Amino acid sequence: SWELKINKLVKTASPGRRPELPQKIRIIGGVWRSRLLSVLDLSGLRPTTDRVRETVFNWLGQDLVGLNCLDLFAGTGVLGFEAASRHANSVTLIEKDKKAYAKLLANFALLQSSPAPGLVQILHKDSLEFLKQQADRSSNLIFIDPPFQEDGLLNQALAEAARICDDSAGGGIYVEFPASRTREQIE
């Protein structure tokens, strides 16, 4: 059951009126610490805040050596870039939106003045289709933050993520979902 793989890595976000998006967000740890990433003003985009990322990476540990990570529905890519900054073995960011994908590439190019310790791939694909093509237990840490307005997307992504997640190395599945839903509703 994927329930065991989520552990305590669950964050809820409030639906409703979207707060003002920051123009820039910063990497908070690792080799890219304090580096700024530009943020698109894109409908449905909700960058994970510094405070939430700090909590997540305190749970995970500051050093992700040996972990293979996926950042699904990557948006700003900040979760994936944080993992890469903290020495993840590999990080794959998946984004379907053409503008968000282009911004991911631009932000990564800026970060490359200090190369990532591991492999970073940014793919312009549908996250669900990508997941379906992956082998069982092929990733250690999976970030899932889908568009909230697309019903059923979260549950489908979780089912596939549970299949490919190998959490034996200390990883797991991190999920962002609307505060209007309970954890039981997505399990």
Sequence positions of predicted segments:
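Class I S-adenosyl-L-methionine-dependent methyltransferase catalytic core
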Residues: 1-187
